[in-house]
C-alpha cells in the first residue's frame, strides 16, 4: 500500500508542494534509488542481525515517512522522504523472502505465494482507500467554519489537506504491524550463528553463482515486462488501435491487474499440490504463447482481451515461484535474495523507460507487444539453462559421495594390509631369532659330545630335547600357530 498509494495521490502531492507534475516526477527516481539501496543493504544485514528486528525497524521507518509526507511543502524534501520509504520497502522485499525461505525451506512455496499475493492485495486496496478517505472523513465545514471549496483542500488541523489523509491511515496501519514485529522479536530466541548450521540445511549447487546470476537476468526481464505492460497497455490501446474508447482501454488495464491479483491468490492453493518448477514452467509457457498471440493479432479486439488475461495470469506466479524453485537446489542467503530484488528493480526502471522512448519514436509500431515477446523469449531460454546448472549438483554430489566412500574404504583396507604385513614381518624376525638360537645350542651340544664320547647318549637325548623345545617355541610364536590357538579358544 505504501508504494501503490503514490499513483492515485500524485496530483495531490504536486498541489501540496505547490509545484508541477514534471518537477515532482523525481520522487519516483528517489524512491527507486532508495529501493535499490535498501535491497542491497538488507541482503547484508539480514545475515548478521535478527531478521524480525530489521523488519520491525523497516516498517517503523515506512510509517514515519508516510506520516511526514503531508507536511512536505518542498519537492526536494518530498523526494528525500520517498527515498527513505523506498529504502524501507527494499528491506521489506528482501527480508520477507529470506524469512519465509529460512522458516519453511523446501515447503516455502505456498507461504511465499501468500507473501506476494499480499503485495498485489495492497496495490489493489490503496487506490480504494485513497478514495474512501475523501468520502467518509468525519469532518464537515461547520466544525471548522470554512467554505465548501476550502473544505476539499484543507479540512484537517495543522494545515493538512484532506487528500493527504490516506498517507496517515496507511502509516498508522504499518505502525501497528511494526509493533507486532517488535513483540515477535522480543519473544524469539537468539539466532544461532551460521557456522553452527547443519550441513543438511545448507546446500550449495555446483554452479551456484551462475544460477544466481541467470536468475537475476530472469527477474530483470520478467518484472520489467510486467511493469511495462501494466503501465502502457492503456496508452497502447488508445494510440495504436483505431476506433477504441477510453473505457475499453481502461478495461484492459483493469483486466491485466485484476487477473494478476486473482491468480496470485489462487497460487497459494496451487503451490500445495504443484512443484515450484512446474508452476514456473507453466508461467514461462503461458507468457510466451500469450505474447506471441498479442504480436500476431495486435489489432484484434477479442484476442487482445484474451491475450491480456492469459499474460497477466502467467505473470502472477513467476516471481514467487522462482524464489521457491531455486531454494530446492541451492541455499538462498541475504545477498542472493537482495540480488534478485535488485534485478527486479532495475528491470522495473529500464524496460518501461525503453518502451516509452521507442513508442515515441515508432508510434505506428506495436513496441509494447514486441517487448513482451522478447522478454518472454528471453525467460524461455534462461529457464532450461538454469535448470541444467541447478540440477548438475545432484549428479556431482552423488558421484563425490560414492567416490569418497570408495576412497575411505580403500584407505582403511590398505591400512589393515600394512598392519598385517608389519605384524607378519615381526613374527618372521622372531622365528629367525629362534632358529639361530637353536643352531647355537646344537653346535654347543655337538662340541660337548665330541669331547666326551662316554656321554654320547645323554648328549643325544639333550640334543633331541633341545630341538623339540625350539620347534615348539617357534611354533607357538608363529602367526599361524597363534591363529590356530585363537581359533581353538573361540571354539
From Swiss-Prot:
Annotated segments matching region Disordered: 397-425, 438-491
Membrane-spanning ranges: 26-46, 52-72, 81-101, 119-139, 165-185, 210-230, 255-275, 277-297, 303-323, 338-358, 365-385
Topology term for the membrane: Multi-pass membrane protein
Bias-annotated ranges (Polar residues): 440-458
GO process annotations (BP): sodium ion transport
Subcellular location: Apical cell membrane
Compositionally biased residues, Acidic residues: 416-425
Coiled coil ranges: none
MF term (GO), any: symporter activity
Keyword Metal-binding tagged: no
CDD domains in the cross-refs: MFS_NaGLT1_MFSD4B
Key words of the record: Cell membrane, Ion transport, Membrane, Sodium, Sodium transport, Sugar transport, Symport, Transmembrane, Transmembrane helix, Transport
Keyword presence, Transcription: no
Its biological purpose: May function as a sodium-dependent glucose transporter. Potential channels for urea in the inner medulla of kidney.
Protein family per UniProt: Belongs to the major facilitator superfamily.
Protein name (database record): Sodium-dependent glucose transporter 1
Organism expressing this protein natively: Xenopus laevis (African clawed frog)
Lineage of origin: Eukaryota, Metazoa, Chordata, Craniata, Vertebrata
Amino acid at each position: 500500500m505504501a508504494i501503490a498509494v503514490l499513483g492515485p495521490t500524485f496530483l495531490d502531492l504536486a498541489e501540496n508542494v505547490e509545484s508541477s507534475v514534471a518537477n515532482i516526477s523525481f520522487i519516483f527516481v528517489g524512491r527507486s534509488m532508495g529501493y535499490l539501496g535498501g535491497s542491497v543493504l538488507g541482503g547484508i544485514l539480514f545475515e548478521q542481525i535478527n531478521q524480525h528486528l530489521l523488519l520491525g525497524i523497516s516498517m517503523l521507518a515506512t510509517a514515519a515517512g508516510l506520516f511526514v509526507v503531508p507536511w512536505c511543502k518542498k519537492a526536494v524534501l518530498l523526494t528525500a522522504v520517498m527515498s527513505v520509504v523506498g529504502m524501507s520497502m527494499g528491506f521489506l522485499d528482501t527480508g520477507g523472502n529470506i524469512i519465509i525461505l529460512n522458516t519453511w525451506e523446501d515447503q516455502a512455496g505456498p507461504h511465499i505465494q501468500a507473501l506476494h499475493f499480499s503485495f498485489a492485495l495492497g496495490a489493489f486496496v490503496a487506490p480504494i482507500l485513497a478514495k474512501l478517505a475523501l468520502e467518509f472523513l468525519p469532518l464537515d465545514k461547520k466544525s471548522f467554519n470554512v467554505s465548501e471549496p476550502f473544505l476539499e483542500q484543507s479540512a484537517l488541523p495543522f494545515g493538512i489537506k484532506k487528500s493527504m489523509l490516506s498517507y496517515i491511515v496507511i502509516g498508522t496501519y504499518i505502525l501497528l504491524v511494526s509493533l507486532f514485529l517488535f513483540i515477535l522479536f522480543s519473544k524469539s530466541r537468539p539466532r544461532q550463528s551460521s557456522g553452527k548450521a547443519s550441513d543438511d540445511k545448507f546446500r550449495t549447487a555446483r554452479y551456484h553463482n551462475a544460477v544466481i546470476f541467470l536468475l537475476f537476468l530472469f527477474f530483470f526481464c520478467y518484472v520489467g515486462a510486467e511493469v511495462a505492460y501494466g503501465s502502457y497497455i492503456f496508452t497502447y490501446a488508445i494510440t495504436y488501435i483505431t476506433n477504441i474508447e477510453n473505457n475499453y482501454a481502461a478495461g484492459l488495464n483493469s483486466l491485466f491487474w485484476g487477473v494478476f491479483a486473482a491468480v496470485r491468490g489462487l497460487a497459494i492453493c496451487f503451490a500445495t499440490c504443484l512443484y515450484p518448477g512446474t508452476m514456473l514452467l507453466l508461467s514461462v509457457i503461458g507468457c510466451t504463447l500469450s505474447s506471441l498471440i498479442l504480436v500476431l493479432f495486435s489489432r484484434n479486439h477479442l484476442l487482445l482481451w484474451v491475450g491480456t488475461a492469459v499474460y497477466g495470469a502467467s505473470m502472477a506466479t513467476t516471481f514467487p515461484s522462482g524464489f521457491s524453485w531455486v531454494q530446492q537446489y541451492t541455499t538462498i542467503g541475504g545477498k542472493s535474495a537482495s540480488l534478485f530484488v535488485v534485478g527486479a528493480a532495475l528491470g522495473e526502471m529500464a524496460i518501461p523507460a525503453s518502451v516509452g522512448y521507442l513508442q515515441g519514436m515508432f508510434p505506428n509500431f506495436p513496441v509494447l507487444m514486441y517487448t513482451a515477446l522478447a522478454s518472454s523469449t528471453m525467460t524461455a531460454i534462461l529457464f532450461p539453462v538454469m535448470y541444467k546448472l541447478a540440477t548438475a549438483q545432484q549428479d556431482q554430489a552423488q558421484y563425490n559421495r560414492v567416490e569418497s566412500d570408495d576412497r575411505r574404504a580403500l584407505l582403511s583396507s590398505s591400512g589393515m594390509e600394512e598392519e598385517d604385513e608389519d605384524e607378519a614381518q615381526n613374527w618372521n624376525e622372531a622365528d629367525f631369532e629362534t632358529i639361530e638360537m637353536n643352531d647355537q645350542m646344537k653346535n654347543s651340544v655337538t662340541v660337548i659330545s665330541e669331547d666326551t664320547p662316554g656321554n654320547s647318549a645323554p648328549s643325544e637325548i639333550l640334543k633331541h630335547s633341545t630341538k623339540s623345545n625350539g620347534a615348539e617355541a617357534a611354533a607357538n610364536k608363529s602367526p599361524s600357530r597363534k591363529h590356530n590357538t585363537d581359533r581353538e579358544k573361540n571354539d
